[in-house]
Amino acid sequence: MKPQLLLPLLLAALLPMTASAQSGEGEFPDLFNTSAAYDILAVFPQADKLAEDPFFTGTLGADTLFLDRAHRIDSVVRPSQLCNLYSLSGGSKDDPEQVVEFFASFDPESLPQKVRGAWIDEICSVRDELSYCLQRLAQAGYAQYWQEQVRPCLNNAIEQYRIAPEQLGAIHQEITRLAGGQPLDATGSRIYILGNIDNAFALLDETFCCTPLLLDPETARQYRIDFMQVYIHENLHRLSLSGELLDMLQTLYDNDDFYRTHEDRARAYGEGGNEAFVVAAERYVSRRLGRIDDKQVLDEFLVYCDGTHVLAPIVYRYLPDLRNGESFDGFLRRLFDRRIRPGNRFGKRCERNRRHRINAG
């Protein structure tokens, strides 16, 4: 693709689009859950703060080796990677001891080939540090600490949050529509509210982890983000994307300077690759459900990761063309074939349309 083609296509895609949807219904009991197992894996970015807690005086607070190794872990892997790996084990989400046992005996060769990759190699590079720190946390009474000090705060945040079942039903109706023929769990993604994270991330077993900060209306208003936005976003990660589509994305990266420059910046945030597709789909679903207006759609594209997801507004612009029964993956492959593939002239037409709108305005 000629480098100049993607930019005008992006500019044209930023024009407002309205959408609507019918609300659905559904029952989603036990939407929120807690997990001592995931929380113990998420402590490393906050190791210094944890060691200073009076509960750990004389144990972690006096163990400089623990802190040194925790810092090493934090510099190499993210909590989302550790939680994702443990999610594949089938172990208890409530028992930190099972986490200790899993990482002490973990064999990367036992993993399915499809989940292996650089992230597993990164975890393996700090296996000794992980084993030591997890054992020290267990010995210092982390399970008791979590029950007494972490869990009550999480339960309070959960109890204060209110959501209507019909809202969840409408969301999952939209996600099922985007899935095409792909089967999805009818009750949606299980949500773990963790005390040791300040973000949200999806897990490979179609569940996801979320900070309790997103359940607080005041925090949501302050940072212009709310739990339902994150819930939609993370559930959209359940949609399958084919190797063929990812190859198309790589071809674009290899052949388009404009896209490559922005994609490199997105990757620096840890949000590259197919993340632009999910961002576009979240805005599309939220707009169809009437949760946001056109200005909020545009604002998200401009500010999310500093506007680096240049494909997101293009995908959003054409999502209304999703065919009946077509999967999100099928739609994206068709979009690449007809609109973003190398050599097409759509970008030039979009540039002419954009200039016409500017002159008319």
Question: Language model features by range: what are they?
Answer:
Residues P8-P16:
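Bacterial N-terminal signal peptides
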Residues Q22-D107, C305-F328:
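N-terminal mature-domain "stem" immediately C-terminal to a signal peptide or N-terminal signal-anchor/transmembrane
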Residues V76-E174:
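Long, mid-chain structured domain cores
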Residues P112-G117, H172, R190-I225:
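Active-site scaffold of zinc-dependent metalloenzymes
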Residues V150-D205:
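Auxiliary, metal-adjacent structural segments of Zn-dependent hydrolase domains
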Residues I225-L246:
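Active-site recognition of the HExxH zinc-binding catalytic motif
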Residues S242-G270:
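Post-HEXXH active-site segment of zinc metalloproteases
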Residues E282, G290-G361:
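Pan-zinc metallopeptidase signature
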